[in-house]
Amino acid sequence: CVVGIGAGMWDRLFDVPRPEYLHDFEALQGGKHSAPSTPGDLFFHLRASTLDMCFELARQIMRRLGPAVSTYDEVHAFRYLDNRDPLGFVDGTESPRGQAAVAAALINEGAWAGGSYIIEQKYVHNLTAWDSLSVEEQERVIGRTKLDDTQLPDDEQPTNSHVTMNTIEDADGNELQIVRDNLAFGEASGEQGTFFMSYAADPRVTELMLRRMFLGEPEGNYDRILDFSTPLTGCLFFAPPAAFLDDADQYARPSARPEAGPQDPTQPATELSAAKDLGFNASSEAPRDQTPDDHSN
């Protein structure tokens, strides 16, 4: 289980400054597509090999939190086939593994060493429109082949493919990485989509990828996948290292400590509530090979 804390919640709960890059998710408005900002207070990412284990842990968490929180979105997700998304393509192929994943996902020094920034977006797919494309057209949207998951050659890679928009480099030509832990979700008779989650030592990497996708690179040349996938949520959380959570009481504001007693019922929210769209998220799936063993999920 990973626990993420939103910017507003951090300010209300803790008497220490926010981690450097913790802020509300910034909405993006492109010429054709937009990414909404739906700030939340708490985010729980639960993983297990079976759904019942996730359900039981989620139930215990909610019992402990009680009336202090309101649940605004709970997504039960799953591993789909050989790590494919509902569009039929393998997801997370370029996500780093092993120590490279640790370096990309976890802050490696300073007061927040071992922590990570989480950005989540819940995408719903228009599968009717997607399935109307030929396989070759779909491959040009994604930038990879559908059957064997091979990246298209550079001279065939569209400038607006999903691969192109998510490939960014620093000034020295080194590719900047994040750890993706996307989940498929949906009902056969209803809504189907992908729950995007990125873990990063520096969320500005993910934010740059999203700006390229929605605003375009150059401007107007947006990620073609957005013609078929629409984000419903957008949140940024910070997952503190376990040691901080173990000693959270010593960092809490006086009003947030248990001995402070109940909050004034006339106030709009308790210290643990007021999440607008994603107060609690129970995501379940089988473990994936690309997730490093020492990166708790």
Residue ranges and their predicted role:
Residues 65, 295-297:
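Short, intrinsically disordered, low-complexity terminal/loop segments
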Residues 255, 273, 283-284, 296:
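Serine residues within intrinsically disordered or low-complexity segments
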Residues 1-259:
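Long, histidine/aromatic-enriched segments associated with O2/redox biology
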Residues 51, 267-268:
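Generic alpha-helix initiation/capping and coil-helix boundary signal
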Residues 227, 268-270:
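Alpha-helical interaction segments
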Residues 260-263, 267, 276, 284-288, ...:
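A cross-taxon signal for low-complexity, glycine/charged-rich
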